[in-house]
Curated annotation (Swiss-Prot):
It comes from Salmo salar. Both ATG8-interaction motifs (AIM1 and AIM2) are required for the association with ATG8 family proteins. The N-terminal TOM1-binding domain (residues 1-53) is a disordered domain that partially folds when bound to the GAT domain of TOM1. The gene is tollip. Belongs to the tollip family. GO terms for biological process: autophagy; inflammatory response; innate immune response; phosphorylation; ubiquitin-dependent protein catabolic process. This is Toll-interacting protein.
Length: 275
C-alpha cells in the first residue's frame, strides 16, 4: 500500500508503486508494427523453425534484347526470396549474352512460393543500371524431386516480357528438422513503385555473413549441412554422357538427387528432351 507525503519539491510516493508506473501503453498500431517486425526477424534470421526446404537456383545465362550504353554491359543477377537477397558474380563484357552458371542455395520460408529476379549492369562511376526483371513462381513439381530447366521472359524498357529471356535450373530438397542454413545475405530496404517493381532505397546495405547473429537475436546452433555426395568420377561420367549440358548444371542435378546416379541420369534425359 503506497502513501503520499508532501515535501519542499512536491508530492512523492512512498511504498509500493503501481504496476503501470512510468509505463506508456502502446497503441494498437504500435503493437501491430512490433508484431510485424518480430515476424520479419523470424523469417530473416530464423533457422529451422521457419524453413521448410532448400531451393537450388542455377542462374545459367541470359539472352537480352539490347546492349544499353556505349560499351559492352557487365551484367549480374540479383535474386530476392523472402527477406534474403542473393547476387551472382558479374559477367564482365557479357553484353547481350551474359553467362553466369552460378548456383544459389536459398532457404524457403513458409508461405513463400515465388522469387523476384533482376539483372543489373555494373557501373564503375555511377549507380548500377537495372536492365531487366521478372517474377518467377516456384514450380510445384520441384517438391516431388524433379529438376526444372526453363527459360523465363524478362521485362524492361522494351516492355513487359520483351527484354529477353533468362535460363534457370531449379531443384528442391527437404531439410531435416533442426538443420540451420546461414549463407551470406544482403539485406536491402526496398520500396515498391508502380510499373517498376521493388526498387532499393538509397543507403548502404547491411551484410550478415555466416556465423553472425544480429544483436537481440538468439544464436541458433550450427549444424553441419549434409551435402549430397558428388564424386568427380560420377560428374565426369555424366558430363561425357551429356556433353551439351554445363558441368555446374550436371553437378546441381546430382546433388538434388542426393548422389543417386540413376535418378540423376533420368533427370538429365528429361532435361535434354525438353531442349
Amino acid at each position: 500500500m503506497s502513501t503520499t507525503i508532501s515535501t519542499q519539491r512536491g508530492q512523492v510516493y512512498i511504498g509500493e508503486l503501481p504496476q503501470d508506473f512510468l509505463r506508456i501503453t502502446p497503441t494498437q498500431q504500435q503493437q501491430q508494427v512490433q508484431l510485424d517486425a518480430q515476424a520479419a526477424q523470424q523469417l530473416q534470421y530464423g533457422g529451422s523453425l521457419g524453413t521448410v526446404g532448400r531451393l537450388s537456383i542455377t542462374v545459367v545465362q541470359a539472352k537480352l534484347a539490347k546492349n544499353y550504353g556505349m560499351t559492352r554491359m557487365d551484367p549480374y543477377c540479383r535474386v530476392r526470396l523472402g527477406y534474403a537477397v542473393y547476387e551472382t558474380p558479374t559477367a564482365h563484357n557479357g553484353a547481350k549474352n551474359p553467362r553466369w552458371n552460378k548456383v544459389i542455395q536459398c532457404t524457403v520460408p513458409p508461405g513463400v512460393d515465388s522469387f523476384y529476379l533482376e539483372i543489373f549492369d555494373e557501373r564503375a562511376f555511377s549507380m548500377d543500371d537495372r536492365i531487366a526483371w521478372t517474377h518467377v513462381t516456384i514450380p510445384e513439381g520441384l517438391r516431388e524431386g524433379s529438376v526444372v530447366d526453363e527459360w523465363y521472359s524478362l521485362s524492361g524498357r522494351q516492355g513487359d516480357d520483351k527484354e529477353g529471356m533468362i535460363n534457370l535450373v531449379m531443384s528442391y530438397a527437404n531439410m531435416p528438422a533442426g538443420m540451420h542454413m546461414s549463407p551470406p545475405v544482403v539485406l536491402m530496404p526496398t520500396v515498391y513503385q508502380q510499373g517498376v517493381g521493388y526498387v532499393p532505397i538509397a543507403g548502404v546495405p547491411t551484410v550478415y555473413n555466416q556465423g553472425m547473429v544480429p544483436m537481440g537475436m538468439p544464436a541458433a546452433p550450427t549444424v553441419a549441412a549434409q551435402e549430397a555426395p558428388c564424386s568427380e568420377e560420377d560428374l565426369k561420367a555424366l558430363q561425357d554422357m551429356f556433353p551439351n549440358l554445363d558441368r555446374e548444371v550436371i553437378r546441381t542435378v546430382i546433388e538434388a538427387q542426393q548422389g543417386n546416379k540413376d535418378a540423376a541420369i533420368n533427370s538429365l534425359l528429361q532435361m535434354t528432351e525438353e531442349l
